Design a protein with these regions (language model features):
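Charged substrate- and nucleic-acid-binding regions of tRNA-handling and nucleotidyl-transfer enzymes
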Residues: 104-173
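Small-residue-rich helix-loop
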Residues: 2-118, 177, 184, 188
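Long, charge-rich low-complexity segments
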Residues: 166-192
């Protein structure tokens, strides 16, 4: 493929067909694309078409979603270093494992119900799950993110975070954060 041909693919407007073709060229997708891949592409477009006008902007997001691991900023990882958070993330992983299909589930609502069992506030619960799954604090709704990641990636990413938190220093948080400010992890309260 010439550089001009590659540029034409990357600079194409983001559509179902242009994304599928670019994913095949980047070896993220086999050819011909199976029906499940077209559903994945449709979900991706629903989640990200507004922020990705071209294939060039979409492919790094596709790569992040297809990766088996995620890089979590150190300070965010420290915020997760708490027993309730580790158990909460494990419960979310079990919830995912129990689902036959991740499409069409009220994931945001279900995550909040799980969070209540561990005394976590709703905004903190969503933040914990999003950071564990993407390494970022914002993104598309869980109802779209979960099907894009799929069962295996969700469980691998949560498992990796839990393993990292439980080994090494364990659940002992750092005493001070940036600028010497006393550091606090996300903590649950006693469920009512």
């Amino acid at each position: 493929m010439t550089p001009e041909e590659e540029a034409a693919i990357l600079d194409a407007a983001l559509t179902r067909d242009t994304l599928a073709h670019a994913m095949q060229v980047a070896r993220f997708l086999e050819s011909p694309a199976p029906a499940a891949a077209w559903r994945w592409i449709d979900t991706f477009l629903e989640a990200f078409a507004g922020e990705c006008p071209t294939v060039r902007e979409a492919l790094p997001i596709v790569a992040d979603l297809r990766a088996e691991a995620v890089i979590v900023p150190a300070i965010d990882l420290e915020k997760l270093r708490n027993r309730q958070v580790v158990f909460f993330l494990d419960a979310v992983s079990q919830y995912v494992d129990d689902q036959r299909e991740l499409r069409g589930l009220p994931v945001s609502r279900d995550v909040l119900e799980i969070a209540k069992e561990f005394g976590l506030k709703s905004d903190e619960a969503h933040w914990c799950v999003r950071v564990a799954l993407t390494g970022k604090s914002t993104g598309c709704p869980f109802e779209l993110l979960f099907p894009l990641l799929g069962h295996d990636r969700i469980m691998m990413r949560i498992g990796a975070i839990s393993s990292h938190l439980l080994h090494g220093r364990g659940l002992e948080p750092i005493p001070y954060g940036p600028g010497g400010v006393p550091f606090k992890t996300i903590e649950g309260t006693k469920p009512t």
